[in-house]
Swiss-Prot record:
Gene that encodes the chain: yacG
NCBIfam families per record: PRK00418.1
Keywords for the protein's UniProt record, in alphabetical order: Metal-binding, Zinc
Binding positions for Zn(2+) per the UniProt entry: 7, 10, 26, 30
Subunit-level organization: Interacts with GyrB.
Protein name: DNA gyrase inhibitor YacG
One Gene Ontology MF term: DNA topoisomerase type II (double strand cut, ATP-hydrolyzing) inhibitor activity
Function: Inhibits all the catalytic activities of DNA gyrase by preventing its interaction with DNA. Acts by binding directly to the C-terminal domain of GyrB, which probably disrupts DNA binding by the gyrase.
Cofactor(s) in the UniProt record: Zn(2+)
Family in the record: Belongs to the DNA gyrase inhibitor YacG family.
Matches recorded under InterPro entries: DNA_gyrase_inhibitor_YacG, Znf_NHR/GATA
Cofactor mode of binding and number, as noted: Binds 1 zinc ion.
Organism: Shewanella woodyi (strain ATCC 51908 / MS32)
Length: 70
């Protein structure tokens, strides 16, 4: 029995096999809608910021000093 998944955009059933041209999407339209959502930042992968602005302030980093010449 072939594996079936839901299209992430329209929730239509999609057969998952080598002939599925747009998998996991059902069609090119749904694929492009999803791409547009990523491009407009409706979708995002959550990440923890490498540096917290408050931590940098506590360490003594000041934006005003950044552009001063020595």
């Amino acid at each position: 029995m072939p594996t079936s998944v839901k299209c992430p955009t329209c929730q239509k059933d999609v057969i998952w096999n080598n002939e599925s041209k747009f998998k996991p999407f059902c069609c090119e339209r749904c694929k492009l809608i999803d791409l547009g959502d990523w491009a407009s930042e409706k979708h995002a992968i959550p990440v923890k910021p490498e540096f917290d602005a408050d931590d940098l302030d506590n360490l003594g980093y000041d934006e005003a000093d950044f552009f001063k010449e020595n």
